Amino acid sequence: MAPDISKKRLPCKVLVFNLPPTLPEQVFLQSINSFLPHVEWHRFSKGKATVGTRSELLSFAYLKFQSATAVQEFFRVYQGHTFIDKKNNTYRAIVTIAPYQKIPPSKVKADSLEGSLEQDPKFQEFKVQRESYSQTASNDDVIEKLQTSTPLLQYLAEKKNAVVEKGKSKPSKKSVKAKKKLRLAEKPASNNSKAGKSSQESKKSSKAPAESAAAVIKEDKVSDRKKSKKKPKKTPVSNSTASQASENASDKKTKEKKSSGKQKIASKKKDQLTTDNV
C-alpha cells in the first residue's frame, strides 16, 4: 500500500521481499535500474535454496528513497514484479514500508584521539620512568624485590617446613614393614614358650589329683586287708538249736530214700510193660 503524501513525516525506507532464494544482487539492481538515481541507500540479503529437509529462505532488500513521490512511483511500478528461476518457479515481489526507518551512518566519525598516543603527557612520563629504571636497576635488585615475602608467605613457608620435618622424623614405610615382620616372627616363639609352660603346669595340676586318688585307693585296700585278717568271733550254739539241726538232717535223708524207692518201682513197671508188648 502506497504512503499518504498528506502526512507531515513521510516514510522513505521500503522493504522488498518474497524474492527468489537464488536471485543475485546484480539482477535485482538491474530490475530497479530506473529508480536507482532516486535511491540513496540500499541493502540486499540473499536467501538459501532447499537442501535436504531444510526449507528455502527467500531473498529480501531494503531501499531508502530521497523523496516520497519516488516511493509512490516505486510502489505503483514494482508491486507484484515477477521472477522465474531455473526450475520455472514463479515469485512475485511484495513492497511494503519498512518498520524501522533509520539507516546506518554512511560516514564513520573519526576518533579525535587516534594517533595522539605519543603526544600524551602520561605516556611520556611512563616512557621516562621505564628508561631510568632499566638503567639503574640490576637483575639482583629485581630478584630481591620479587622475593620479598609477606606474612602470609612466611606462614606458608613455616607450615611447609614443619611438614617436612615431621616427614623426616617419621620412619619410612620399609622400616615399618621390617619391624612388623620381626614382631610376627617373635610372636610364634613367645607363643611356643607360653604353650610349653602352660602344658607343664597342666601336667603338674593333673598329676596332683591323680596322686591324691592313688593314695586314697591304697589306704582303702590296706583297711580292707586289715579287716579280712581279723577272725570273726564264734557265737556259742545252744543245745536246742543243735538238736533241731540233727532232726532236720534225718528228715531229709528219709525223704530222699522214699523218693529213690518210688523211682525204682516205676522203672520196673515200665520194663514189664515193654516185655509184654513184645
UniProtKB/Swiss-Prot annotation:
Localization per Swiss-Prot or TrEMBL: Nucleus, Nucleolus
Keyword presence, Nucleus: yes
Family matches, as Pfam families: Smg4_UPF3
Region annotation Disordered: where it falls in the sequence: 163-278
Biased composition (Low complexity): 207-216
GO MF annotation terms: mRNA binding
Gene Ontology process terms (BP): nuclear-transcribed mRNA catabolic process, 3'-5' exonucleolytic nonsense-mediated decay; nuclear-transcribed mRNA catabolic process, nonsense-mediated decay; positive regulation of translation
GO cellular component: cytoplasm; nucleolus
Coiled coil spans: none
Biased amino acid composition, Basic and acidic residues: 249-259, 268-278
Bias type Basic residues, positions: 169-182
InterPro entries: Nucleotide-bd_a/b_plait_sf, RBD_domain_sf, Upf3, UPF3_dom
Keywords: Nonsense-mediated mRNA decay, Nucleus
Principal localisation: nucleus
Homology family: Belongs to the RENT3 family.
Function: Involved in nonsense-mediated decay of mRNAs containing premature stop codons.
Designated name of the protein: Nonsense-mediated mRNA decay protein 3
Organism taxonomic ancestry: Eukaryota, Fungi, Dikarya, Ascomycota, Taphrinomycotina
